[in-house]
Amino acid sequence: MKHIRNFSIIAHIDHGKSTLADRLIERCGGLADRQMQAQVLDSMDLEKERGITIKAQTAALQYQARDGQVYQLNLIDTPGHVDFSYEVSRSLSACEGALLVVDASQGVEAQTVANCYTALELGVEVVPVLNKMDLPNADPDNAKAEIEDVIGIDATDAIPCSAKTGMGIDDILQAIVAKVPAPRGQADGPLRAMIIDSWFDSYVGVVMLVRVVDGRLLKGERIKMMASGAVYNADGLGVFTPANEPRDALAAGQVGYVIAGIKELQAAKVGDTITLEKKLPNNAGPAAQALPGFKEIQPQVFAGLYPTEASAYDSLRDALEKLKLNDASLHYEPEVSQALGFGFRCGFLGLLHMEIVQERLEREFDQDLITTAPSVVYQVVKADGQVLMVENPSKMPDQGRLSEIREPIVTVHLYMPQDYVGPVMTLANQKRGVQMNMAYHGRQVMLTYDMPLGEIVLDFFDKLKSVSRGYASMDYTFKEYRASDVVKVDILLNGDKVDALSIIVHRSQSQHRGRAVVAKMREIISRQMYDVAIQAAIGANIIARETIKALRKNVLAKCYGGDITRKRKLLEKQKAGKKRMKQIGSVEVPQEAFLAILQVQE
C-alpha cells in the first residue's frame, strides 16, 4: 500500500487539465502509441468539444521514481464545473493529493478556487503546478502570488510545466511521489469501498468506479450497498490504465471498477459505500458504518422539455431513460401542458447541466425539443401551515391561499480584474444581490453576494460575461430558503391562461417583466380575423395588455356616397360575424413564443 498514490487534477476550464493528463499517461506508458489520442480521458464528443470534463475517469499508471522504486499512481480525473460540484467532492475524497493546475498566463479562476477549497476541507494535499509556460505571455511570478493570495497555500515551489511541449512532466510525477501521502486504511479490515462514479454499459450493465478504502474485494464475492441495502454479485473487477484491464482482486488503496450485473444507475449512487454481504471464513465480514460524505443530489433548476411533434413523445421518453442510465443527477417526470401537449418536467443540477442534457438529446438521440423557461424550486407555506415545494409555475396555488413564498438563496463568489468591479456590482444589484464581502487579491477582486437562484438561472451568467468582457468568473453554492415577495405572472390570450408561459418573479419586477413578455408576444402571434387581447395578470389584476388588431375587409368599398344607415348596416353585419368567429376560434401560439420568454431582456 505504501507504493500507491491516488491523486486528481483541479483546474479551471481550458487551463490544460486533460492535456496534462494525456502527458502523464504517455510518460508512464499507460497506453500503446497507437491508442494514444488527444484528451484520452474525455470520452464523450461533447466533452471534447466544449473542452470540459463531465464524467470522472481514471487511469492507473506505473511510474518508476528516481530512487528506482516503482509506484502505482492512480489519476482520478474530476469534472471542473460548478454544476458538478458533488461529483468533484466524491472524486477528491477518493484521493490523498491533488495537482492544482493554474494557467500561468491567466492566473486563478473562480471554479479552481471553489474546487481547491473543497480539496483543502477534505484534507487533500494540494500540489501547485503552473501550466502553459511555453506561452510568450506566461507570468509565473504573478500566478504564484495569486495562488498564495487567493487560495492561501504556499506556492514558492510550484512546478513550472507545459503539457503541450511535455516540459516539467517528470518533475510533476516526482512531486506526486514525494508530497502526496500514501493511502491510509486497514488492509485486513472489513471491506469499505466508495463509489466515485458509475456509468451504464449496454453489454455488462452498470460499471462502478470505486476506491477501496479498507479491506479487499475478490471476484465473485457478494457485495452490499450501504445506502440502499441491495445485494449483488461482484462478477468482474479490474483497473483502467485508461484501457480496462481485468483483475481478480482489488486491495485497500486501489482504484478500479466493479461490475455486478446491476440494471439501473439508481442502484449505484455516487458516494455510496460498498461492503460485503456476510462474514465468511476467508473475509473480514461487512463494515459497521459507511464512509462519510454521502448525500442524495437534489436538482436545483427545472425546465419542461417537449417534443416538437406529438408523435415523438415515446422516443423522447426512451432518450431520457438512456441518458438517465449515465447521469443519475437528471430527474424527469411526465407533464402535460395545454399549449405544448405531452412532455417532461426535468430537474438539473444547474444551467450548464441543462444545456448539456439538451445538447446530448438533440445530438445523440436526434430529438427536436422545445424547452420552457428554466425555473427554480420555491418553498410555499399555505395558510394552514402546510409546506409545499413548487418547481413549476403552473402548479403554484392562488396567492389568496398562501401565507408566504420562500425562494432559494445562493452564495455567489465572483472573481474579476479590478477594472470591472463597477459594472459587475451594478449587475449584481439589479439581480437583487446583497453584498456580503469584497476582497482584493493583487489585481483580482473577489466579491461575495447572497442572491436569489431564480435571478441567476435566467441570464446572469451571460450578462456577467458581457459586462466584464469575459474576464469575470463565478461559482455558487446553495445557502437557504428565504421568505420573499414573489408573485406568479400569468399570460392570458383572449382571457385564456397559457400555462407554459407563466413565470414567477419578484413583485418589484413583475410589471416590467409582464410588459416585456406581452410586447414580445404581440410581435410573434400572427393577426387573426378578430382582435386578440394579450394580457399579463397577477391573480385577477391585469398588469399589462397589448391588442393585436383584427384583419378586416373594407366592406364600405362599394358604397358611393349615399346614406349613413346603409354603411352602418354593413359594418354591424361585419362586426357580428367577427364576434361569432371569436367565440369559436382559438389562437395558435407558435413555438417561438416559448423561446421568446427566455429572451425577454431586462
From Swiss-Prot:
Domain tr-type G: 2-184
Binding site residues for GTP: 14-19, 131-134
GO molecular function: GTP binding; GTPase activity; guanosine tetraphosphate binding; ribosome binding; translation elongation factor activity
Main location: membrane
Broad class of enzyme this protein falls into: hydrolase
Membrane topology: Peripheral membrane protein
Disulfide bonds: none
EC code: 3.6.5.n1
Cellular localization per UniProt: Cell inner membrane
SMART domains: EFG_C
GO cellular component term of the entry, any: plasma membrane
Catalysed transformations (reactions): GTP + H2O = GDP + phosphate + H(+)
GO biological process, one term: positive regulation of translation
Alphabetical keyword list: Cell inner membrane, Cell membrane, GTP-binding, Hydrolase, Membrane, Nucleotide-binding, Protein biosynthesis
UniProt function note: Required for accurate and efficient protein synthesis under certain stress conditions. May act as a fidelity factor of the translation reaction, by catalyzing a one-codon backward translocation of tRNAs on improperly translocated ribosomes. Back-translocation proceeds from a post-translocation (POST) complex to a pre-translocation (PRE) complex, thus giving elongation factor G a second chance to translocate the tRNAs correctly. Binds to ribosomes in a GTP-dependent manner.
Cross-referenced PANTHER family: TRANSLATION FACTOR GUF1 HOMOLOG, CHLOROPLASTIC, TRANSLATION FACTOR GUF1-RELATED
Protein family membership: Belongs to the TRAFAC class translation factor GTPase superfamily. Classic translation factor GTPase family. LepA subfamily.
HAMAP family assigned to the protein according to its UniProt record, in alphabetical order: LepA
Protein name: Elongation factor 4
Native source species: Verminephrobacter eiseniae (strain EF01-2)
Organism placement in taxonomy: Bacteria, Pseudomonadati, Pseudomonadota, Betaproteobacteria, Burkholderiales
Gene: lepA
